[in-house]
Amino acid sequence: HVRVSFPEQVGNFKEEEVLMSTIYVWIIAMFVISIIIAVVRPMIKGKVGEAAVSLLLKQLASDKYKIVNDVILSSEGGNTSTTQIDHIVVSVYGIFSIETKNYKGWICGTENAKQWTQSIYGHKYKFMNPIHQNYAHVKALESMLRSNGYEAVPIYSIIAFPGDTTLKVTANKARVVKWGAVVDTVKNLSDTVCLSDDDVEKITMKLMDREAEKTQLREHINEIHEVKV
């Protein structure tokens, strides 16, 4: 007698189909996760760097230096675009615009180059010249100051990298230093009084108002999203 086992074969086929579907789902999930990590990781690294420099800046005397972090200003020219500044230090000696980078390895670049190079673990990566990036921040600050009646206030550009970075950079218009040298750099540039204590308070409040506006905008956007959901 011949025994027919079609039901068993069909069952095996379905099990294989389910297994393959599961494998495909896992592959797609891992692909999506890898994309998310690739996008989010630089953001996390950037925020870690900003937090480290923000903590170091607290070493500055609070009666002489006012610190405002993560400020969004309108770009120069009064258009609708904006620019985000990691740290602004306001003092009677002028204003310091600090751009924080969390890139390790060897950093090579010049003041006028469009891109700089990071060399690490035998690989080279290009990134935007942070001096150019901070120049846009300086111009935005100048525009904001002019609109509030402040002319010719010195604004110093500082670019900060981690302590274990090797810097091979030539620059005159900006100070390119390591995180641990940021405070001393600010102090070394603090040689001529150009603003009154009252001016420092007013400018700081203007920057903090911008921060409050940014927070309100984020809350408003979140509320809109919640309504849509």
What is each of the regions a protein language model found here?
Residues C108-T110:
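Acidic/histidine-enriched active-site and ligand-binding environments that engage anionic O-linkages
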Residues H1-L19:
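Short, Lys/Arg-enriched N-terminal segments with co-localized hydrophobic residues
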Residues F13-T83, V90-I95, K104-W106, Q115, ...:
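Surface-exposed interaction regions that form or flank ligand-binding interfaces
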